[in-house]
Amino acid sequence: MIEVVCNDRLGKKVRVKCNTDDTIGDLKKLIAAQTGTRWNKIVLKKWYTIFKDHVSLGDYEIHDGMNLELYYQ
């Protein structure tokens, strides 16, 4: 079980607990449950890498305590 921190730079910082074998789509659904936005409107980035929904967190090497950028489309 890892904890990922997502910051939208607008004052909202979300901490989500998930597993490394969860997909980015699963992570978006957990974030959407906490923020109240729709999961398909969320874009997760790290620097210039946009994370795709079907790839797992372990494949992207997302570890415990990692910060991700949260954008809305």
From Swiss-Prot:
Key words, A-Z: Cytoplasm, Nucleus, Ubl conjugation pathway
Entry annotated with the keyword Metal-binding: no
Annotated Gene Ontology cellular component terms: Cajal body; cytoplasm; nucleoplasm; nucleus
Result of altering residue 22 to A: Does not impair binding to SART1 nor its pre-mRNA splicing function
Subcellular location field: Cytoplasm; Nucleus; Nucleus, Cajal body
Domain Ubiquitin-like: 1-73
InterPro entries: Hub1/Ubl5 (IPR039732), Ubiquitin-like_dom (IPR000626), Ubiquitin-like_domsf (IPR029071)
Tissue: Ubiquitous. Highest level of expression in heart, skeletal muscle, kidney, liver, iris and lymphoblasts.
One of the GO biological process terms: mRNA splicing, via spliceosome
Pfam family, one: ubiquitin
Complex formation: Interacts with CLK1, CLK3 and CLK4. Interacts with coilin/COIL. Interacts with spliceosome components SART1 and EFTUD2. Interacts with FANCI; this interaction promotes FANCI dimerization.
Protein function: Ubiquitin-like protein that plays a role in cell proliferation and sister chromatid cohesion by associating with spliceosomal proteins. Participates thereby in pre-mRNA splicing by maintaining spliceosome integrity. Promotes the functional integrity of the Fanconi anemia DNA repair pathway by interacting with FANCI component and subsequently mediating the formation of FANCI homodimers. Also plays a protective role against ER stress-induced apoptosis.
Full protein name: Ubiquitin-like protein 5
Organism lineage: Eukaryota, Metazoa, Chordata, Craniata, Vertebrata
Gene it is expressed from: UBL5
